């Protein structure tokens, strides 16, 4: 689960509406599923009470802005897991000036656009279960074509250690839409030296 919080520190579940409303991904081709999930997220932002949009923006909201769906930004990644007794605590600054303690579970190794790259995967300190991994990142679009505070990926823990790293599912944290949310910024180790033109982007 991505660790975005309202300032009153309740947890936010970003993807619950997709799990509840979406049929199995096996029922649709990959690109169609991405398009469907984007439409569902747009609808959630417009209609659901847990939408991060302030009330004065809901009435004019139509859809989020996305890069075109591009399968070249969907790559396999291998997670090199750190031993439990050697997992580092990384202090991440947040959008409200706080510090968040995150545990580095391991590093995802993958190749994107011909470059061998790595991203660290985290869980929030104190989490008793490690069934979802939080992967915040920045890249060469950050602050230009995408939010200056970076973007996030959420991964369901894979027993095999191999992950479907799909940057078409990269999303902006809630603090991009509403300053009352407290969102961690990606650490320096997760700055990618490539432009990831996939997933959510800034409006034109």
Language-model region placement:
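C-terminal motif of bacterial Sec signal peptides marking the signal peptidase cleavage site
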Residues: 18-20
């Amino acid at each position: 689960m991505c660790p975005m919080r309202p300032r009153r520190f309740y947890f936010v579940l970003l993807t619950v509406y997709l799990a509840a409303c979406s049929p199995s991904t096996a029922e649709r081709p990959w690109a169609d599923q991405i398009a469907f999930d984007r439409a569902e997220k747009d609808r959630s932002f417009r209609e659901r009470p847990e939408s991060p949009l302030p009330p004065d923006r809901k009435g004019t909201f139509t859809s989020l802005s996305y890069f075109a769906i591009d399968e070249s930004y969907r790559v396999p990644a291998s997670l090199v897991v750190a031993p439990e007794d050697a997992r580092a605590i990384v202090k991440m600054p947040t959008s409200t000036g706080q510090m968040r303690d995150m545990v580095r579970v391991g590093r995802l190794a993958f190749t994107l656009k011909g470059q061998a790259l790595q991203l660290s995967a985290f869980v929030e300190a104190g989490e008793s279960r490690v069934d979802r991994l939080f992967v915040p990142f920045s890249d060469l679009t950050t602050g230009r074509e995408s939010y200056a505070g970076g973007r996030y990926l959420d991964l369901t823990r894979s027993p095999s250690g191999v992950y479907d790293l799909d940057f078409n599912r990269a999303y902006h944290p809630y603090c991009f839409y509403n300053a009352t949310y407290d969102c961690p910024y990606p650490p320096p180790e997760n700055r990618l030296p490539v432009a990831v033109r996939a997933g959510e982007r800034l409006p034109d």
